Amino acid sequence: MSYDIIGEIAIIYPPVDDLDKIVNKILKHHKYVKAIYLKTDKLETELRLPKLKLLYGEPILETTYKENKCVFKLRVDKVYFSPRLSTERKEFIDLVKDNEKILIPFAGVNPYPIVIAKHRKVQIKSIELNPWAVKYGIINTKLNKVNVDTILADFGIAWKYIRNLHNKEGIVTKYVNELLKAKPELDLVYTNEEYYDLLNQYYNTKLIEELKPGIEYFDRIIMPLPKGGEHFIFEALVLAKKYIHLYSFAHEKEIEQKVKEIIDIASQLREIKHYDYKIVGDIGVRKYRIRINIYLI
């Protein structure tokens, strides 16, 4: 039995033996909750969008969540967000030093970039594929009065153009708003194919063709995508100067092997000074979310 509280919204995760019991528990311990949803499917798509069933209260989907002296606005049905990673995000306040240049692909609504930028004098660029997450990511940078250059892009394509990708003069904000307004069917998109068809029609004609390729280098790259993030290790190794923080999922007995596989791939492309890993949360029985820290020469 597990659930998350995101602002005024509670989300229950299956399997659940007694829904009424957990709903009553939430209402007893979280008086401010106005809506309780059951997540009805796994986050299997690239956008990690949940399908939700309202169990109690008002059908509100947009909420405001606070952590680490930051505030985040989001729609729980349009973006992936985990309050369970609050402590993990806080750790980067100590890991990151002032004046670092940081890239964060798979940034969602910008929780990692904003928590870091709120506490450190840094230059951050974030990349996210989901236009809803980009929309809220830009809103959240303004709410928190921090400067995070937030880009709508597929990191697998955008890394080649990274030096020339900016939300300069609100160009990304404009594109995101146009995309969401012009393609209301995105409300129902849950498969990669449908989304990529829409995004490619728009993105390739509106942005990429107007840019020239250009590589940019970053002191630190943080990749908060545990499912499939390792597939982008090449791009990260090309762009990183010093540090890469990569997330993955692994069973208790497979953690060491998972880390070794990723490090073996990375060491073929770059010389590694040191690496370590940390378990940052559980996702099931003896299954964990891990962060792999790679220190480059």
UniProtKB/Swiss-Prot annotation:
Pfam families: TRM5-TYW2_MTfase (PF02475)
Keywords from the named record: Cytoplasm, Methyltransferase, S-adenosyl-L-methionine, Transferase, tRNA processing
Highest taxon of source: Archaea
Family: Belongs to the class I-like SAM-binding methyltransferase superfamily. TRM5/TYW2 family.
Recorded name of the encoding gene: taw22
Record-level GO cellular component terms: cytoplasm
SUPFAM superfamilies, per the entry: S-adenosyl-L-methionine-dependent methyltransferases
GO molecular function: tRNA (guanine(37)-N1)-methyltransferase activity
UniProt-annotated binding residues for S-adenosyl-L-methionine: 89, 106, 128-129
Any one GO biological process: tRNA N1-guanine methylation
Main location, first listed in the record: cytoplasm
Localization per record: Cytoplasm
Broadest EC class assigned to this enzyme: transferase
E.C. designation(s): 2.1.1.-, 2.1.1.228
Name of the protein: tRNA (guanine(37)-N(1))/4-demethylwyosine(37)-methyltransferase Taw22
Reactions the enzyme catalyzes: guanosine(37) in tRNA + S-adenosyl-L-methionine = N(1)-methylguanosine(37) in tRNA + S-adenosyl-L-homocysteine + H(+); 4-demethylwyosine(37) in tRNA(Phe) + S-adenosyl-L-methionine = isowyosine(37) in tRNA(Phe) + S-adenosyl-L-homocysteine + H(+)
Function, as annotated: Catalyzes both the N1-methylation of guanosine and the C7-methylation of 4-demethylwyosine (imG-14) at position 37 in tRNA(Phe).
